[in-house]
Amino acid sequence: MEVLRRSSVFAAEIMDAFDRSPTDKELVAQAKALGREYVHARLLRAGLSWSAPERASPAPGGRLAEVCTVLLRLGDELEQIRPSVYRNVARQLHIPLQSEPVVTDAFLAVAGHIFSAGITWGKVVSLYSVAAGLAVDCVRQAQPAMVHALVDCLGEFVRKTLATWLRRRGGWTDVLKCVVSTDPGFRSHWLVATLCSFGRFLKAAFFLLLPER
């Protein structure tokens, strides 16, 4: 009961932060909460399950739920353009999933390249899709503990790289301004640009991860 009470209080604090200017700590907590929901949704879509301690609390509500819904819909658009890009991410990176440092280092390498030329919401969505793709790979290979590490790693990357950008835009709710097209024949320019670059990010990250000879 105490765990459930603390989880409920934590969830309430996260959602409350959407109603005012968030601190960096709150932005990171929100990033991780969104990451857990994003990963959970992608695992369900793949017919897989994962138990996150924080998910003992009620499903996100209010603005947090809206942000999560938009992130997932934008992620759907990204993945519909080229479905293979965000699948079998571990195989594309040529990494084993038994080592937490290898998995998190690979994720951070890809994340660093995604944002090497600046920050956009398209790239943020891509970051979440990469994390979810790796999470699916981990669960399929009986490494569910790696998912927790990925979510923590995502939060740390947001703290170091995205928090200032997010704060200047008033927080995660800024993504609600993004237009999600319901026309399957239309794809926003920023989505296409993100996808065109992502293959290069994977290749660059692969070479960064090669052992020194």
From Swiss-Prot:
Transmembrane segments: 190-210
UniProt subcellular location: Mitochondrion membrane; Endoplasmic reticulum membrane; Mitochondrion inner membrane; Cytoplasm
GO cellular component labels: cis-Golgi network membrane; early endosome membrane; endoplasmic reticulum membrane; mitochondrial inner membrane; mitochondrial membrane; mitochondrial outer membrane; nuclear outer membrane; nucleus
Taxonomy, superkingdom: Eukaryota
Tissues/organs with expression: Widely expressed. Highly expressed in brain, kidney, and spleen.
Induction: Induced upon proteasome inhibition.
Keywords: Apoptosis, Cytoplasm, Endoplasmic reticulum, Endosome, Golgi apparatus, Isopeptide bond, Membrane, Mitochondrion, Mitochondrion inner membrane, Mitochondrion outer membrane, Nucleus, Phosphoprotein, Transmembrane, Transmembrane helix, Ubl conjugation
Motif BH1: chain residues: 113-132
Motif position, BH2: 165-179
UniProt cross-references to PROSITE patterns, sorted A to Z: BCL2_FAMILY (PS50062)
Motif BH3 location, chain numbering: 67-83
A single GO molecular function term of this UniProt record: BH domain binding
Cross-link Glycyl lysine isopeptide (Lys-Gly) (interchain with G-Cter in ubiquitin), sequence positions: K25, K32, K160, K177
Phosphoserine carried by residues: S7
Region of interest called Interactions with ITPR1, as start-end residue ranges on this chain: 15-45
Complexes and interactors: Monomer; positively regulates apoptotic process. Homodimer. Heterodimer. Oligomer; promoted by apoptotic stimuli and BH3-only proteins; mediates constitutive activation. Interacts (via BH4 domain) with ITPR1; enhances BOK expression and stabilization; limits apoptosis and prevents ubiquitination and then degradation; protects ITPR1 from proteolysis by CASP3 during apoptosis. Interacts with ITPR2 and ITPR3; binds most strongly to ITPR2, and barely to ITPR3; regulates their expression. Interacts with XPO1; translocates to the cytoplasm. Interacts with BNIP3; promotes oligomerization.
Record-given protein name: Bcl-2-related ovarian killer protein
Organism field: Mus musculus
Species lineage: Eukaryota, Metazoa, Chordata, Craniata, Vertebrata
